[in-house]
Regions:
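Glycine-rich active-site loops that engage anionic ligands at enzyme catalytic sites
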Residues: 115-168
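Well-ordered alpha/beta subsegment
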Residues: 162-199
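Electropositive, beta-rich accessory/interaction domains or terminal extensions
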Residues: 1-124, 128-137, 186, 190-194, ...
Length: 199
């Protein structure tokens, strides 16, 4: 199977009212809500035009969301069916649209077990990305999915998706092919990296 981009997804941060375990109301700002776009999108060093992140603080020397090492988030379409087969509550009670997990690119043909840290991906005609690390899901995923503690399920099974930095800026659109330009077989896969991080 040829690896390719199925959807390009962007969104701006939005404020949500949520309730904690004590029924106290809180306002949470999140950028997890992404929607597919029909047009091509320019990808710069900081991410996709028209996309935004809510929490860009630096914690323990890593930016929570955004930044050059988390400029583009890829999520494999194959995981959608796996989640739907395991869950029928919350958001999984209805079919999910691409971008549901907050990804910028919904992709097919490769996943965390076949992608290595440092892999260089050529996307479409000119965009070049380099894989940096797996997603570390936060509590806002629980809100999106409407299942308490769902982020821990993502951690346990390793269906995290992964972030990339932008090596060469360029356009991306649905249907673009993704080619492996460089890969170091001694580097850990995204899944291995994720499992070590949890250990």
């Amino acid at each position: 199977m040829t690896a390719r981009v199925l959807s390009v997804c962007v969104g701006q941060p939005k404020a949500l009212k949520v309730f904690d375990a004590h029924a106290a109301e809180h306002l949470v700002v999140t950028g997890i809500y992404k929607e597919p776009v029909e047009h091509e999108v320019w990808v710069r060093a900081w991410g996709l035009e028209g996309d935004g992140q809510a929490d860009t603080r630096v914690v323990k020397r890593r930016q929570v969301h955004g930044g050059v090492d988390q400029a583009v988030y890829l999520y494999p379409i194959e995981h959608y069916a796996k989640w739907a087969s395991e869950w029928t509550t919350g958001a999984f009670a209805a079919p999910l649209e691409h971008g549901f997990f907050g990804e910028n690119l919904t992709v097919e043909g490769f996943d965390e077990s076949t992608t290595r840290v440092g892999d260089v991906l050529r996307v479409g005609e000119g965009l070049v990305l380099q894989v940096t690390h797996p997603r570390g899901p936060c509590y806002k995923l629980d809100i999106r999915v409407a299942i308490p503690e769902f982020r821990h399920q993502m951690d346990l099974n390793g269906r995290t998706g992964f972030y990339c930095r932008v090596v060469t800026e360029g356009l991306v659109s649905a249907g673009d092919t993704i080619e492996m330009a460089e890969s170091d077989s001694s580097a850990p896969t995204i899944l291995e990296y994720h499992q070590r991080r949890l250990a």
